[in-house]
Amino acid sequence: MKGYHSCVMKGGVIGIPIIFMLLAGAIFSFANDDVVEDWLRNNSLVIESEDGETLPIQNNESWLVLIVDFSDSDNQQSSMISAAETMLIPHAQNYINELSHGTVDLEIDIHNVMFTAPNTMAAYGSDTGIKRDSDIDGTHLPMILAEEVIVEFSEAIDWSKYDLNADGSVDRLLILHTAIGQETGGDSNRIWSHFAMFQKPLNLPKGMISSHYAMASLGSESDGFGTAMHEM
């Protein structure tokens, strides 16, 4: 596909939720320690509405990965795309293959343009009191970043490829920011990796919508992979 770096794995079908399968694989790879699962549960966020639902893993999985930098950073686009490839390919496919016994087709598309956000990292990641990544009125700041990323690439992407059940909604979207995630020891101005449902779905071309996303860190290296898989 034009505009993407893609990697495909072939297979069949599996019927368990993707988040638990990927979490198990990430935990097994990066630490054979029971405390890792508890750590991930305690150090990542899930922001969603009560009736928010995500699609369980499908016969054919297609994931879109978008990369975002910040106005106070000077990361090179080629380096960040390469870092995303190193983090995800072929590791994500290998976990899917192992845990599904080769029964899932997984394609990962890493968009080949990096978006530079209009604001600093702290503008999207600062904590207010005990509220993670939120301003004083409770607004979840990284969701603003996610909206900016999606709007930026709205016309450049065939979003229908990531609608896995043909209901008009994007099912798999991973946004990778270039900084270190707060869950791996960053300061209080950094972004916690998370999964979130938009309060109101974003409109996309051709009648598509984006109702949720996962966000994780490129700067956290191997820890970033485990957390990214957890959030997906």
Question: What do the predicted segments below correspond to?
Answer:
Residues 1-9:
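N-terminal Lys/Arg-rich, disordered targeting/topogenic segments
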